[in-house]
């Protein structure tokens, strides 16, 4: 029997998959903070602290990038280039040594951030939601199956703004590896198929404005193009 709803329903957010007609349904978006040493330093951290995570709505996704509108209520809008992981299997208390078995594939993502609102939250002991979780705050490339590329743990991760390089690092510079992140998250949540993890950004984050063109890439994974449009 078909389910009836009291209001109009909505489509499940999803990502295209390289070489496939099927799409990857997105359930939740977890994001890790300060996971590259140099970025940790530029944000005021020091050392291998416990990983910490925040959530973005799955409806913040912008599949395959394209046009992203400058958000409201900010004058300090930042990019953060990240390796994105999509899970095919869930579980609790996942062993880091077997965590790769849970991964469907990888993508290039941007954790777009209203830095001034994030900083206000930090300064006042408030949540970061207004700074991190808002419309169009998670542009993401097509997902590449791990069956095709394996599990990248090294390779360049970079971002150019208007043709000028702003971020450049290597995936091996991560403080917490992808398997370690999955294992840690699974101690606090029951992970599910369709969960997505943004695995942290390297140093070089900075502001952008309407008209700017962003090109992000990760060796062996792909590229993501975004153009900033004026606020709606």
Residue positions per predicted region:
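Catalytic-pocket segment enriched in acidic/His residues
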Residues: 2-23, 39, 45-47, 115-232
């Amino acid at each position: 029997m078909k389910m009836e709803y009291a209001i109009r329903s909505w489509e499940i957010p999803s990502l295209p998959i390289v070489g496939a007609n099927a799409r990857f349904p997105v359930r939740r978006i977890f994001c890790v903070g300060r996971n590259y040493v140099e970025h940790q330093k530029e944000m005021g951290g020091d050392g291998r602290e416990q990983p910490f995570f925040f959530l973005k709505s799955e409806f913040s996704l912008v599949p395959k990038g394209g046009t992203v509108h400058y958000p409201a209520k900010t004058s300090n809008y930042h990019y953060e280039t990240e390796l994105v992981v999509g899970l095919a299997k869930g579980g609790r208390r996942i062993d880091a040594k077997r965590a790769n078995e849970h991964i469907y594939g990888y993508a290039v993502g941007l954790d777009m951030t209203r830095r001034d609102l994030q900083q206000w939250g930090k300064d006042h002991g408030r949540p970061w939601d207004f700074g991190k979780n808002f419309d169009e705050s998670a542009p993401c490339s097509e997902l590449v199956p791990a069956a095709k590329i394996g599990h990248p743990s090294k390779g360049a991760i970079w971002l150019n703004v208007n043709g000028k390089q702003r971020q450049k690092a290597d995936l091996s510079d991560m403080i917490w590896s992808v398997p370690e992140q999955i294992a840690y998250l699974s101690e606090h949540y029951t992970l599910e198929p369709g969960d997505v993890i943004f695995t942290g950004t390297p140093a070089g984050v900075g502001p952008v404005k309407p008209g700017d063109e962003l090109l992000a890439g990760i060796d062996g994974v792909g590229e993501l193009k975004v153009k900033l449009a004026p606020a709606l």
